[in-house]
Amino acid sequence: MDAPDLEALVRELADKEAIRELARRYAHHVWQLEVDALVDLFAEDGEMDTSLEEPIRGRPALREAFQRLVDDDEADLQPFVHNHVIELDGDRASGTAYIDLRSVREGRSMLGSGYYRDRYVRRGDGWKFQSRGLVLRFFVPLHDGWAEGEAAED
């Protein structure tokens, strides 16, 4: 492998690792309820779409939405990110990051699973989320389970 090929490979590996770290930090800051740190992971015009409401656009709106989540006593979210697939395209990239989600709602243990459809952009201070779209496959009470007719025994 000649030097230019090696340099390109190292750049690709470094970019992919930086993007994986972006997704890990997102989960970490959700766990730690760190609103400002969460918002900083997004580009200035970044967007979050949970499919539960209209997409949230721009850092001020993201800050407000994340703060509401932190202030909600029922919003005990614990995401685990894994199986991250990334496609690079210069200073842009796209990816899918799968999540398992634990939470408590109305005093009940909840379990969720799904994935994020992400678009990333490289800025002067590193990789940022341009957009993050959450697709939940299920989010159910642990006791009920997610397969029809397979609720846990009392």
What is the predicted function of each stretch?
Residues 35-101:
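A solvent-exposed, acidic/Ser-Thr-rich amphipathic alpha-helical stretch
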Residues 1-28, 32, 36, 40:
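Short, low-complexity N-terminal intrinsically disordered segments enriched in polar/charged residues
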Residues 15, 19, 58, 112:
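Hydrophobic (often cysteine-bearing) scaffold residues that line and stabilize catalytic clefts
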Residues 79-81, 111-116:
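Short, surface-exposed coil-to-beta transition loops
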Residues 94, 113-143:
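Short beta-strand edge/turn micro-motifs at domain boundaries
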Residues 140-154:
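Acidic/histidine-enriched, glycine/proline-rich intrinsically disordered or flexible terminal extensions
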